[in-house]
């Protein structure tokens, strides 16, 4: 801000405060004998306005408000280029400096705790009850909005509490997913295989791979669907529908991991138009130490107690 505008703002602000002080004292009336008997000549419905001075507490409230304003402008920036003299902030208070100060205080308090767990493997951290509680709180703050408070997911968001993992369920894969995120793309096959191909493949996947019954009256050729699957789908999902973690291709021989639904219509929609899912990378926002705890918590959700004990 230029010197002119800084001075203009400071002069206008301070001038307003001085003017308010003058106005309050100039219009103040003191107590006088017989004051309560004098009226202003205003009356309505038997109610008259008396010529009494402002109550003392009210007058002092005005003064206190102006004094508070002056103190605030001394401590905080508010008069042009004036930075304020609030203790603890070199060069004046700003919201960025306050945030940095709070982060530094949090790091000083919790840094040793995070460092302790960062030196342990994810599998070891998953066996520590205190660490798991910390991870659960982090999960509730940062992950539950998509994956649910119970980590069982919802339509379009995977269940993190079962054994079905698109990108791998080992500790390293889970941590990588949280740190770097994942981008999953299921291409649309509607134009390539046609509407009949979509219906046939969907029926084949649901009945022959996942073992789910088809709705009564379903008109589909399972043999033709198997051929189309082998030509267009098996390269990612596997010949037997076992999936491929390297590509994030889900298992098709179990409906447990079908996050977009398992009905015949939902399968057809997925094959026809494809799907695009994204897990945002959290490293920049949470940092390595918090992600380490989160990974341990998520890892613990899909492990039985005896599995954790054998890590």
UniProtKB/Swiss-Prot annotation:
- Subcellular localization, as worded in the UniProt entry: Cell inner membrane
Q: Which GO terms describe its biological process?
A: oxidative phosphorylation; proton transmembrane transport
User: What is a single Pfam family found in this protein's UniProt entry?
Assistant: Cytochrome_CBB3
GO MF, one term, reads: metal ion binding
**Entry cofactors:** heme c
Q: Which superkingdom does the taxonomy of this entry point to?
A: Bacteria
Q: Name one GO cellular component term.
A: cytochrome complex
For this chain, the family text in UniProt reads:
Belongs to the CcoP / FixP family.
Its protein name is Cbb3-type cytochrome c oxidase subunit CcoP1
- What does the organism's lineage look like at the top? Bacteria, Pseudomonadati, Pseudomonadota, Gammaproteobacteria, Pseudomonadales
């Amino acid at each position: 801000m230029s010197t002119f505008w800084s001075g203009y703002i400071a002069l206008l602000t301070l001038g307003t405060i001085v003017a308010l002080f003058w106005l309050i004292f100039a219009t103040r009336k003191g107590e006088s004998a017989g004051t309560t008997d004098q009226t202003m000549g205003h009356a309505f419905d038997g109610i008259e306005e008396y010529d009494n001075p402002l109550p003392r507490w009210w007058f002092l409230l005005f003064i206190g408000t102006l004094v508070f304003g002056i103190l605030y402008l001394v401590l905080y920036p508010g008069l042009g280029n004036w930075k304020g003299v609030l203790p603890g902030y070199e060069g004046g208070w700003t919201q960025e400096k306050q945030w940095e100060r709070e982060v530094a205080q949090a790091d000083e308090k919790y840094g040793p705790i995070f460092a302790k767990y960062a030196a342990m493997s994810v599998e070891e951290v998953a066996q520590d009850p205190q660490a798991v509680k910390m991870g659960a709180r982090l999960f509730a703050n940062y992950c539950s909005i998509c994956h649910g408070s119970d980590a069982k997911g919802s339509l379009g968001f995977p269940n993190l509490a079962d054994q079905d993992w698109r990108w791998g369920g080992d500790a390293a894969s889970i941590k990588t997913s949280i740190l770097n995120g994942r981008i999953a793309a299921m291409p649309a096959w509607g134009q390539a295989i046609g509407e009949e191909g979509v219906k046939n493949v969907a029926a084949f996947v649901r009945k022959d791979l996942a073992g789910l019954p088809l709705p009564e009256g379903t008109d589909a050729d399972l043999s033709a669907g198997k051929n189309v699957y082998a030509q267009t789908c098996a390269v990612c999902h596997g010949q037997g529908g076992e999936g491929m973690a390297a590509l994030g291709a889900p298992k098709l021989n179990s409906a447990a991991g079908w996050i977009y639904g398992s009905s015949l219509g939902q399968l057809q929609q997925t094959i026809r138009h494809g799907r695009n899912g994204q897990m945002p990378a959290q490293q920049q926002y949470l940092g390595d130490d918090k992600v380490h705890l989160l990974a341990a918590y998520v890892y613990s959700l899909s492990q039985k107690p005896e599995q954790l004990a054998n890590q």
